[in-house]
Amino acid sequence: LKLGFADAQETAIGATIVKTEYEKMIASGKHDVIISSCCHSVNALIQKYYPSVLPYLADVLSPMLAHCRVIKEENPGACAVFIGPCISKKEEAELYGECDVALTYEELEAWMNEAGVVPAGDSTEPDEGKRGRFFPIKGGIIKSMHTENTGFTYLAVDGVQNCIAAIKEIESGALKNCFIEMNACEGACINGPAISHHHKPLLSGEVKVVAFAGDDEFRVAMPIDTFKNIP
C-alpha cells in the first residue's frame, strides 16, 4: 500500500487462461504444430528472423497480458503492473498495451529500499496447489496442461540456441502433431536475468515451484478475447 498498490495477484491466474486456450487449440484438430506464445523473447525471435514459422506460433496472449486484460475487465480504470524476473516483458508491455508497467524484481527491490518498505511475513494460509504455478519452470507449461489422449507429442525447449535449432527443425517440416514449449532462458522463467541476489540455484528453485504448485485449477474468468494480433 505504501508504494501505491491496491492489490496483488499471481500471474499463474493468467497462465491458467493461456494453457486453457492451448488445450482448445489442440482439441480443435486445426493445428499440426503449436509453439507456445508465453516467452516474448521467443516470439520476437520468430517474428524478426523466422517469419515462415509464424503460423505455428500460438496466437494467444502471454500470461502477463491475459492476466492484465482480466484485471482491467473486472476493474475498469485500473493500472496493471507486472513484476517478474524478465527484461523482455518491458518491450511486450509497450507493444500490446494491456500491461501499463512491467517491472523487474530488482527494480521493485530498489524501490522498496528507497521507500523504506520492509516486507512482512506471509500471513496467508496455504491453499491447494494450482497447475498454473508450474509455468515458470522448464516443461511447466506442459505440466499445467491436460495432455492425455490428444494425439500430440509435448516437447519443452529452453535456451536461445536450442530454441533456434527447434525453430529451424519446425521450419523444415520435420515435426507433426507437436506442442512445443519454448523459453529463451535456460531453465525457463525462474532463471530469468533480473532476480538479483534472491536467485536460487536452478534445481532448488524448481523444487520450490513444484512444491507450491499442484493439480488444482484456478477458478478464473476468461477474458472476452484471449487472442492478439502479432505485430
Model regions: which residues?
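Iron-sulfur-associated redox domains of electron-transfer enzymes in respiratory
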Residues: 1-231
